[in-house]
Amino acid sequence: MHNNEQDRISPISRRSFIATAVAGLTIASVAASPLKHLQGGPIKIKAIAFDAFPIFDPRPVFGLVNQLFPEKGIELAETWRTRQFEYTWLRTAGGIFKDFGAVTEDALVFAANKTGVNLTTAYRRQLMDQYLALDVWPDVLPALETLKRSGIRLAFLSNMTGEMLKSCSRHAKVDSYFEHLISTERAKTYKPSPVAYQLGVDVLQLKKEEILFAAFAGWDASGAKWFGYPTFWVNRQGAPGEELNTSPDGTGKGMTELINFIR
């Protein structure tokens, strides 16, 4: 769950994302068409490496926070979300690794202490368990079906642990679409470290130019571009672009735009 303060999901957001008719897209055009890289000539995309959150919808986690702590839910959720990613970046910079589940729980404890809520053992477990049972966004299943038929290989490349990716994939019934569930825990670091992005190249055994990285957060899109991946930002929150001297090759609000981009 790859984000800075601009990329936080508002726990009170009720924005609906309408399922789109991507299943009707022409399969052959998706598979055969080259992609124009911003810094070079035409290239052929052979695989897509997804961050977890263009696929999985994390909003129920923050809805549960509001349900359990109605008076301080917004403050708790925002503090938790911010600290979660700050801890991954701090641990990456310091070279002291803890897996994403542990980091997420540490951030939750910090947020509870800061906001003064009574985080019981039962509440703590309930919130952490929600990260193991995320559903997909409404536009995901038809898009995955289209991509699968096209012959493009699909993988996750996420800061989430392997256990989280496997559990959510099975819960949401999308595990059959993904060839690899690549967690950055394999490298004992987090994105945007180049070592983390290199996992996609190593596991898929493709050139980085042949792997489209699909980011959820603006900072992750920037990190993937720094590494050298052609990059599409699935900007579901409508966040402004980062000021990091790079831009994704494409951007859109959902999976329809992603498929149109690679057609």
PLM region spans:
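N-terminal secretory signal peptides
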Residues: 1-12
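Asp-based, Mg2+/Mn2+-dependent phosphohydrolase catalytic module
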Residues: 2-4, 20, 145, 157, ...
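N-terminal export leaders
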Residues: 12-31
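Bacterial Sec-dependent signal peptides at the C-terminal "C-region" and cleavage site
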Residues: 29-41
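Active-site neighborhood of HAD-like aspartate-dependent phosphohydrolases
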Residues: 41-82
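An amphipathic alpha-helix signature
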Residues: 62, 77, 81, 101-109, ...
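A metal-dependent, Asp-based hydrolase signature
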Residues: 88-125
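Substrate-recognition element of Asp-dependent hydrolases with the DxDx(T/V) motif
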Residues: 123-135, 140-170, 184
